[in-house]
Amino acid sequence: MASKASGGSTRNGRDSNSKRLGVKAFGGQFVKAGSIIIRQRGTKVHPGKNVGLGSDYTIFALKDGIVKFEEKGKKNFVSIEPVEASA
């Protein structure tokens, strides 16, 4: 016979890997086309001009330029101000 009752199983004791969400390029920063600007869950920030929205709601640059964040009403938008190449 067991001299000690078996310990009850715990319900906690798990932790998921961090998803590294958040802003990757801040306002006023220069980015190249294809660069990720924000990783997010849902559209906390909406895409503006010269910006694309991925299937996982990642916002990325479509053109080279300066990142610009703006509020329109209750919604936040991010867009890219294109920079003309000085030749």
UniProtKB/Swiss-Prot annotation:
Keyword terms: Ribonucleoprotein, Ribosomal protein
Bias (Polar residues): 1-11
Residues covered by region (Disordered): 1-21
Biological process terms in GO annotation: translation
Matching Pfam families: Ribosomal_L27
An annotated GO cellular component: cytosolic large ribosomal subunit
Single GO MF descriptor: structural constituent of ribosome
SUPFAM superfamilies per the UniProt record, alphabetical: Ribosomal L27 protein-like
Alphabetical list of InterPro entries matching this protein: Ribosomal_bL27, Ribosomal_bL27_CS
Transmembrane segments: none
Keyword Ribonucleoprotein annotated: yes
Family: Belongs to the bacterial ribosomal protein bL27 family.
NCBIfam families for this protein: L27
Identification of the protein by name: Large ribosomal subunit protein bL27
Species: Hydrogenobaculum sp. (strain Y04AAS1)
Lineage summary: Bacteria, Pseudomonadati, Aquificota, Aquificia, Aquificales
